[in-house]
Every structure is written in C-alpha cells, then in structure tokens.
Amino acid sequence: MNAAKASVRPAPGRHNAWEIAVHAAYWKYAAWRRLTAEKRGMFARPGSNWFASPTPPTEAAWREDVALLVRYHRQLRAAVAGLRDGDLDRRAAGGRETVGRLVRGIAAHDLYHAGQIQLLKRLLR
C-alpha cells in the first residue's frame, strides 16, 4: 500500500489505513509500556489514540509510520516472549487487568484493525 492509498478515507469522518496503522502502533506501545512498567510519554508522536495522517501524504512519511508500527510490534513481541507462565496472572502495571488479559486484548485489537485495513485495501482495488 502506498501513501496515497493509505490516506484514502472510505467515507467522510472515517479513519483511513494510515491513521489505523499509527493507532495500532500507539496501542502496541501502550501495551508494551504496561508489560515493562515503562513511564508514559515515550510514544514517537505527540498525543494519544488517534493521529491525523499528513496532508498531503508523502511516501517518506508513510514509510516512517510503517516503520514505527514495525518497531513497536517488535518491542511488544519481545516483551511477550520474555513472560513466564506465572506472569500471566499478575496485574499489569498501571491498571486493574492481568498481564494475560492485556496480551489477549492487544492481540484482538491488532486483529480487528488488521481486518479493517484489509477491507480498505479491497475497496481501493
């Protein structure tokens, strides 16, 4: 997917694939932070949750945001890979849920948004 396609909105007021990708990166970061007890405020973009895609879209900015998604995905995978069975039942840092529930939740979140992006790609064919 190129920058132009990633920035197409399926309808006015709806998120495009670019915004969904950065949103997914943010929540991978948030889950990683809670798994590792890192401090807040270290995400690569100011703000939280949803981030506007740049206007006009550029390939360089798109590649940068895809790299951001990959980076936070790898960080999260490394944190999850380092968990032991006993860790799954302990409370995640900064919340009421367990580590196991946090991991299942971020996996479900990722799948949901990956599906959205696949649907957007089909709409753009």
Protein language model features and the residues they cover:
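Short, contiguous alpha-helical
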Residues: 3-52, 91-125
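Acidic/histidine-rich alpha-helical segments that form the ligand environment
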Residues: 52-90, 101-106
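Residues that cap or delimit alpha-helices
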Residues: 1-2, 84
